[in-house]
């Protein structure tokens, strides 16, 4: 299942636009100011529709403004009051037709497609009201909200920081992938036991024991009855915290356990590491989930890359779905 067509009306600088997509790789080419980012953001609007903390929202500045020059030399400015974005998905599997039955519509050739229509209307006092329709427009059907969780975007913006995405200590890309493999293997207890052993060894260090003793000595002076002994340990109650401290690095040599941190690496190479991690994560997700839809959206993929690396990246992405 893939996004095969998008129709956009009155969104930012786009008065009306329809774009068709290939089921593998799509490259959007244009000069500055040709609204390439607006097209990408229109796609992101739906793919993040079911996320509780969306990183993109419609504001009053997103409504198209019509500027007309009059014969008397004056200018008339007419802001639109409604944004419409329609999405069509093709290539549905039997499982996806079942999961997205509320989205289905039949084309003239008999094949089934999934349709979604997002609408944003400007109301009084600048209030923006959003709504959606799935399936045939005339039916006015609204699919269950939970179905939007099947759509997953990975986005690298033009002013991106892929290093931060790889090094974050909360819900980072690498940690999610490792956590999924641990869940599949049922090895959470084994991983926690490794941390337990490290915990025991670390707590025997003189530096740690002295710190703990200093805390408790002060507590005795402050409160003799309420707090007596405080213990120290590595927090390992949740497996997510454990895997999120695993970070990529560049070893000095093949067998070396020491090396350069990503913050010491070039931005271009870090972009490649991030893209490789995303594609690995997407392929791994398909092992357990044959329904969800994933999209990798990259603005200015050439950023920080030497021309030869740009060619290598393009050739790789062409076959990334194989």
Model-assigned labels for residue ranges:
Residues 66-73, 100-104, 135-143, 217, ...:
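Short alpha-helical segments and helix-capping/turn motifs at coil-helix boundaries
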Residues 40-107:
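Conserved P-loop NTP-binding catalytic core
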């Amino acid at each position: 299942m893939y996004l095969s067509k998008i129709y956009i009306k009155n969104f930012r600088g786009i008065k009306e636009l329809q774009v068709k997509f290939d089921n593998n790789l799509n490259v959007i080419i244009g000069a500055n100011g040709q609204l390439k980012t607006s097209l990408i953001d229109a796609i992101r609007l739906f793919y993040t529709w079911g996320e509780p903390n969306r990183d993109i929202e419609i504001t009053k500045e997103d409504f198209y403004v019509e500027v007309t020059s009059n014969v008397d030399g004056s200018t008339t400015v007419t802001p639109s009051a409604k944004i419409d974005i329609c999405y069509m998905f093709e290539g549905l599997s039997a499982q996806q037709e079942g999961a997205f039955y509320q989205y289905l519509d039949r084309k003239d050739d008999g094949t089934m497609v999934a349709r979604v229509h997002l609408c944003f209307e400007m109301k009084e006092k600048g209030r923006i009201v959003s709504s959606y329709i799935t399936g045939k427009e005339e039916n006015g059907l609204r699919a269950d909200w939970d179905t939007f969780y099947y759509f997953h975007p990975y986005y690298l913006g033009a002013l991106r920081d892929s290093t931060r995405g790889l090094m974050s200590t909360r819900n980072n890309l690498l940690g999610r992938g490792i956590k999924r493999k641990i869940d599949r293997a049922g090895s959470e207890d084994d991983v926690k036991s490794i941390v337990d052993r490290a915990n025991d060894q670390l707590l025997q260090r003189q530096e740690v024991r002295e710190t703990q003793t200093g805390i408790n000595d002060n507590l005795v002076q402050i409160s003799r009855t309420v707090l007596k002994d405080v213990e120290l340990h590595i927090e390992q109650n949740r497996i997510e915290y454990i895997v999120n401290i695993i970070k990529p690095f560049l070893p000095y040599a093949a067998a070396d356990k020491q090396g350069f941190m990503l913050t010491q690496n070039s931005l271009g190479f870090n972009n490649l590491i991030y893209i490789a991690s995303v594609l690995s994560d997407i392929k791994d997700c398909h092992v357990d989930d044959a329904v969800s839809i994933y999209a990798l959206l990259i603005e200015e993929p050439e950023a920080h890359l030497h021309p030869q690396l740009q060619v290598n990246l393009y050739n790789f992405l062409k076959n990334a779905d194989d």
